[in-house]
Amino acid sequence: VGTLAEFSGLHRTTVRRLLETLQDEGYVRRSRSDDSFRLTINVRQLSDGFRDEHWISALATPLLGELLREVQWPTDITTLDVDAMVVRETTHRFSRLSFHRAMVGRRLPLLLTASGLTWLAFAPDAERDAIVSMLAARPEAEYQLAREPERLAAILARTRQNGYGENFRSWRQEEKIASIAVPVCSQQRVIGCLNLVYIASAMTIEQAAQKHLPALQRVARQIEARMEEEEVWYEMP
C-alpha cells in the first residue's frame, strides 16, 4: 500500500480502498505469505502484462497450503531472475518448523541451492550455458562451480536423473539448512521450481527425498495442470 501510494501520489487510505475494490472484483488477492497485494489470473481480461512469476504464484498458492499440512516443512515457489532464483510464494510464515519468515522476494544463488541447480539442470542448453558463462566470469567464491564445467555437468546430470536438485549445507549463508527441489514446467520448458526446506540435522537428502519427493512432484504436476487449464503458457523470448 505504501509503495503504491508513493508511486501514484494518492493517499494511503485511497489506495487501500482501491485495492480492496479490486480484491472484491477478483483482480488482486492478499498473499498469505506477507500480506502484500498480488495480481490474480483474472487480470488476463484487462492486460497481457501478467508475467510468468505472477501466474505460477497465483495458481500455486492454495496448493502450497495443502502441501504444508502434509509435509510440515516449509516450501517455496521460485522463478529465475537473471542470475538468481527468487522466492515468489512460500509457506515459511506458517510452518512451525521454519526459522525464516520474510522469504518472499529473497534471492537464492543458482549454484548453491536446490532450486538453482534444478533450474539449471532442466533449462534449455543455450539458456543454461549463457547464464553459467556469466556466473563464471564473477570472481566471488560462490560462483566457483561455474568455473568447473565437468563437476557442474556431473551435478546437473545427477539432478536430471534423480528428478530433483539438492543442497545440503552448501550455502554458507544458510549452513544449517538443506533442501530438495523439483521443476515446474510449461510446454516442456522449466518456468520455476518447487522446493522443500528443512534443518539439515533432521535428515539426509536421501531421507528427505524418500519421504517428501512424491508430494513435491505431485504438487508440481498439479500446478502444471492448473496452468494448462487456465491456458497459461510460457512465452519463448
Cite the ranges covered by each PLM segment.
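Amphipathic alpha-helical effector-binding/dimerization core
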Residues: 38-134
